[in-house]
Amino acid sequence: MVFRALLPYSRQIRQAIGNRRVVLKPNNVSIDIPLCATHADTLEGILEFLKSIKKLDNVVIAESAANGPTLDGFSNYGYFRLARKYPVKFIDLDKEKYEILHVFDEKDFRPHPVRFSSVLLSPDSY
């Protein structure tokens, strides 16, 4: 289903990616409750789409799980099986470099420091 949903936008997505690395950022709120995570089949649909537009040569799946070790979540949800079929790498964003940026809270209108992954902030990432 994801593959078919992306197909009408193939040209635009291919052009937008250009020569950049593709970062797939699933949402893993929990590392052991499947309903709190992006399903591996969803990621596979995206990977198949990227393959169809010849943008599968530099893809990473990157996450920072909310309640435990990210790689445990990847294992629990079957993400690692994707590496047997696609040339994808896995990144635990908690173990990568980060930048501190300040965001404003509407309750107190004060800046609060927040860690942002350098992987996600990189202009070389899409």
Residue positions per predicted region:
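N-terminal and secondary-structure boundary signal
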Residues: 1-126
